Amino acid sequence: MTIIVILVIIPVLNAQKSEDKTIKLKIVPVRHYIFSKTDRDAHFWSAIYIASNNKVYVGTSTHASAASVYEFDIATSTMRHLANLTVLLDELGKGIWTNGKIHVKMQELDGYVYFSSFCEDNGPPAIDAGSYNGAYWFRINMETGKVEPLARVSSLWGTTGQAMDKNRRIIYGLDEIGHLRRYFIDENYTEDLGRVDDWDVCRTIFTDEAGNVYGSYPPGLIWKYDPEKERIFNLEFLRLPITIDSRSMANPMLDRRAQWRIIEWDPVDKVAYGIIGGSNLLFKFDVNKGPEGEIIPLAQMCAPAYRGGNPFDVPHATLAMTINQKDRKIYYIPVTRGDFDYDLVSTEIGITGKKAVPSQANRPSSYSFLVTYDLKTGVREDVGILVPTDGSYARGMEGAATDKDGKVWFVGSFEQSDEALKINGGFRSALGLGCYDPFSK
């Protein structure tokens, strides 16, 4: 693997706002794969899973119409479109709200990969909300690729977080309005366990080895569902190491900086590792230590120019974190500039009070930067800027997973290098699948 050292100018808005910080960053070659030359898959959050059959499963989203499911065969480098959810659910062309988003981490059980959906800004805006058929649980047959809808999550609210208790054969879903739902796989029905948060729910929940379910909510708080007691508890004495609390009085706040953004259970250490939404701080959550557990801060994983500076300048954490069991390192992909989700949010307010949202072609570029944390030594390493071998750039990632050989796969926004994609409404970026091999020489 060839590594090139370049100079990258990264604006850092700290006390000396007039100065730029020049940092030497390495360019790290990665592979870039296109999902489709015909579909317009626009967005992605969390939904990447590498199954035991050595295939990558990805759920994409839109803010207009349909969510899609793809399968990528690592052995043959073949991409296959498995399903359009609006076609699968017979929603397309009916003038109703549609299942246009997949926001959850997927799980595998008995030859199937499970996920769930929801609707946000999908379908005609001025319609009767009662026409919506609801959000669903789904499973993918790993042998055939068939995607099958199962029971409904609810008649209206879908999921933004998902975790599985394989022993009890239950899937947990955190819905848009903060209710925790559980799906009984064998019985094929859903149960509402009650509200754990408001609309500003965290994107990821996790289960520990005992089947307890955990989630976070602002400001730096944690809830726990105990399946033995069948109760939801707020952990009273445990706090996340947050540095920023929201000042917004909006409801919902749409902030999420004061909770974890991404978290993953590690079966080796029997702890969870997560990233704080605002500071990009990596932390360890030992659920078995003490009456409620213990939180240990480890390292700030944002791009190097922001470390130790103004905490309000740190770009929002991404969902692109994975634990690599081959080298026992955490791989995380923050962005070099911008804010929430692919640098598509503008925080500039004009004289009229309206948000100024420049065209994508005129925005300053953001880049994906790879950072690792060695769980054996506690050493953080700045690997470098991810640059696909096709000459494009990786702009912002929102999900990552590791295969059995230790290669790191990720999904997000890539600069469009394919001529067939450059007609995409003037947008310079599109969804893609990327791969980084840390063991390639």
Regions found by a protein language model. Name each.
Residues 398-441:
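Blade-level signature of beta-propeller repeat domains, shared across WD40, Kelch, NHL, RCC1
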Residues 115-132, 333-365, 413-430:
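Short, conserved, GDST-rich strand-edge loop motifs in beta-rich repeat architectures
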